[in-house]
Amino acid sequence: MSAIFAAQAGAQVVVIEKNATAGQKLLLTGGGRCNITYTGTVDDFVRVYGKSGRFLRHCLHEFSPDATRDFFGQIRIATKVDEAGCVFPVSESAGNVQYALLDQCKKLGVQFVFGRGVEGIKKHGAEFVISAGKEDLTAHKVIIATGGASYPATGSTGDGYKLAKSLGHTIIGPKPALVPLITSEKWCAELAGISRDNVTISTIIDKKKVSVSGPMIFTYDGIGGPAVLDLSRLLTDYLPAKKPIEVAIDLVPAMNEAKLEEYLMGQLSQYSKKIIANVLFELVPKKLGGLICALAGITETNASQLKKEQRRKVIQLLKKLPLSIEATAPIEDATITRGGISTAEIDPKTMQSKVCPGLYFAGEIIDVDGPCGGYNLQIAWSTGALAGKIQQD
């Protein structure tokens, strides 16, 4: 994005890319469908980003979610909106988005140097000297858009942090964000692969209750899925911890406890000769129902034998299934990275370094991170467009 907008501004642009092609991480976004952005307003984005929102406000006004959709329409990527407000290409292909961006770069005369990583950047007077392989390149301005340290197989290995630090920048310690969570409970392995389209997960952080909602999946060592990834953003600064963080999962958020009890009473009456795990099959998958019965101590109990306190226990487990979170999965498994270049050292109106004039930043390398749903790609587009559009020969 920076290359396109810089070229449109009249700059001669060279992109140094250590991979064989650019945009490899883009191919993973949205499960390969590329969740381009979210339909919210600028104020919605600012609110979601919390403390970082003020820093991002200007770039979002300069290149808003609506402007993003218009831009992609101009490069022949038609978009659509799902029921959650997430914006995808009509083709549902991240590969198409990658191709369109590279094709636009080609049309604008952007030069690419593939297969060469940047080993160092030094500033001599008004010029930068970039060491990349066998020869050095010189430039009047440099935009570092190397991403974070998550998904290193895509080339995102934290190289940009070292380059920025060598030029005087402060790096906020990188941590995994939007990442699966590891639990103390080993029974999660028995449920690995079982998912729920919608759950609500609640916990206490700094004496305040916080909740996230969305799809979830059990994994071999814990839990994953969009709701869990959003929760991980809130927990990553507290993990790993000496004492696990307790969370409660509402497996049936569409029903309150009274409605759930009423429904369950009807099921127990209708299927009085069945064991409880089989009675729960319309609410949760059979394996999950079996686990709930095991936790309630009623594995072999028939519906007709269920006592009131046992029924209350089942309802409690369906509405507040307890889990103890020990740690996040490694940063290599994270969708994005928390941390990076301190926003205090970047001019929010230009994305230019306050430490090293002529140096700019865009995307995940900056210390901002958002939830699932197109928020992080929008920040990549907005910071990239802003860093690029002010460049001139």
What are these regions (language model features)?
Residues V14-I16, V118, D136-S156, A164-K165, ...:
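Short hydrophobic core segments
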Residues A20-A22, L27-L28, I36, V42-D43, ...:
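An anion/pyrophosphate-binding glycine-rich loop and adjacent beta-alpha core
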Residues V113, A132-K141, S211-G214:
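Core beta-strand elements of the Rossmann-like FAD/NAD(P) dinucleotide-binding domain
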